[in-house]
């Protein structure tokens, strides 16, 4: 193996893209800030039992574990920042009984990629709201998610909606146990209608519930899906409430193209209600995903309503505007000491000044000039 090789699905970010990413990160955090979201920076690594909540068993497959040489305890390198933010809200910010609006932008590390085209070191950015159960909170986060997409040239963005509350209401009414629910969840995630029908038949479910479960994978499309679902799904209060929340989101974004999929349920995840995602042309998967995950903080001692979204900012590379490098001022190496005061004055003004050692450099081809002493004064002389 060559010493310069990197692990699979791991890559360097070189200067041109690094400038784009840092600029996008700054714009994103500024956007979050003006909407009231405070920046938090959880550690990259912490005790594994804090990262691997019982709510999301699938997270353990993504988390890289190591032994702490100081304590001998097992540490985990974070694969998702949301559980860390839930811990912060539940423990470190517990004095606030009202709403906590929090945001972040930092690297995570995956033991295995989410897909063949995914990286194992995403730059996860997101915003989360804790302490507000109303659908208006979800609408606020969806609005912020869609605004976040505008920092890159995404073109037309499709908003995809789902609601795991419908499936759970049907599961409870049909008296499915945890194993049966997990089996149906997996089948629905695969959109395997035939397998769903065969499974509920094998369980000999009551006809009404068997029909409802078989119907869910077929309930997808535009806004009209909601009226179709109201007329065909069992009349349960929880189902009606979930459909009402989906309708409220549709009404809040009248000009947005919306796709609804009532079998989009996200297996092995911590979401509990409304699910939302943003899709853009030429992306093989959702650009951003979010949803409601009430109770996640209960693992850390304070269960609260919560909703939020996140995405991999590195996936935006190729859609971000070019960030030109500032033209540099050169100063000859032999003049550097004598011109130190002038050089530092220029740098304090934000001007890039590079010492020219006469062997080439990686600064911009377009130079702002060269620092020369003219009539006893150091001045930038244009070429």
From Swiss-Prot:
GO cellular component, one term: cytoplasm
An individual GO BP term: L-histidine biosynthetic process
Organism superkingdom: Bacteria
Pathway: Amino-acid biosynthesis; L-histidine biosynthesis; L-histidine from 5-phospho-alpha-D-ribose 1-diphosphate: step 1/9
Keyword Cytoplasm included in the entry's annotation: yes
Any one Gene Ontology molecular-function term assigned to this protein's record: histidine-tRNA ligase activity
Pfam family, one: tRNA-synt_His
Subcellular location: Cytoplasm
InterPro entries the record matches: aa-tRNA-synth_II/BPL/LPL, HisRS-like_core, HisRS/HisZ, HisZ
Keyword terms: Amino-acid biosynthesis, Cytoplasm, Histidine biosynthesis
Gene3D superfamilies: Bira Bifunctional Protein, Domain 2
Cited NCBIfam families: PRK12292.1-1, PRK12421.1
Chain's role: Required for the first step of histidine biosynthesis. May allow the feedback regulation of ATP phosphoribosyltransferase activity by histidine.
Family classification: Belongs to the class-II aminoacyl-tRNA synthetase family. HisZ subfamily.
Quaternary data: Heteromultimer composed of HisG and HisZ subunits.
Note: This function is generally fulfilled by the C-terminal part of HisG, which is missing in some bacteria such as this one.
Protein name: ATP phosphoribosyltransferase regulatory subunit
Organism in which the protein naturally occurs: Neisseria meningitidis serogroup C (strain 053442)
């Amino acid at each position: 193996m060559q010493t310069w090789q990197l692990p699979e699905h791991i890559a360097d970010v070189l200067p041109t893209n690094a400038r784009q990413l840092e600029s996008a990160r700054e714009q994103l955090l500024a956007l979050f800030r003006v909407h009231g979201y405070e920046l938090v920076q959880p550690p990259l690594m912490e005790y594994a039992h804090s990262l691997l909540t019982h709510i999301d068993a699938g997270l353990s497959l993504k988390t890289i574990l190591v032994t702490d040489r100081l304590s001998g305890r097992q540490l985990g390198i974070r694969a998702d920042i949301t559980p860390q933010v839930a811990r912060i809200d539940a423990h470190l910010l517990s004095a606030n009984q009202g709403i906590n609006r929090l945001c972040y932008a930092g690297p995570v590390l995956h033991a295995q990629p989410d897909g063949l085209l995914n990286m194992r070191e995403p730059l996860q950015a997101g915003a989360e709201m804790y302490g507000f159960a109303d659908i208006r909170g979800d609408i606020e986060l969806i609005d912020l998610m869609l605004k976040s997409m505008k920092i890159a040239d995404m073109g037309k963005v499709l908003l995809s909606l789902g609601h795991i509350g419908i499936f759970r209401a049907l599961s409870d009414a049909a008296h499915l146990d945890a194993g049966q629910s997990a089996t149906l969840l997996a089948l629905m995630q695969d959109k395997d209608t035939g397998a769903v029908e065969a499974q509920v038949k094998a369980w000999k479910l009551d006809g009404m519930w068997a029909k409802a479960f078989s119907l869910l994978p077929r309930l997808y499309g535009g806004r009209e899906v909601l009226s179709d679902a109201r007329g065909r799904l069992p009349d349960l209060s929880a189902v009606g409430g979930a459909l009402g929340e989906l309708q409220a989101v549709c009404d809040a974004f009248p000009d947005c193209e919306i796709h609804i999929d009532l079998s989009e349920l996200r297996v092995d995840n911590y979401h509990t209600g409304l699910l939302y995602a943003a899709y853009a042309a030429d992306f093989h998967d959702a650009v951003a995903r979010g949803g409601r995950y009430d109770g996640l903080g209960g693992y850390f001692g304070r269960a609260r309503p919560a909703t939020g979204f996140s995405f991999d900012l590195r996936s935006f590379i190729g859609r971000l505007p070019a960030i030109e490098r500032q033209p540099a001022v050169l100063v000859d190496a032999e003049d550097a000491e004598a011109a130190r005061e002038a050089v530092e004055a220029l740098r304090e003004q934000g001007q890039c000044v590079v010492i020219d050692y006469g062997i080439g450099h990686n600064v911009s081809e377009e130079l702002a000039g060269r620092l020369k002493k003219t009539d006893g004064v150091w001045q930038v002389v244009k070429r």
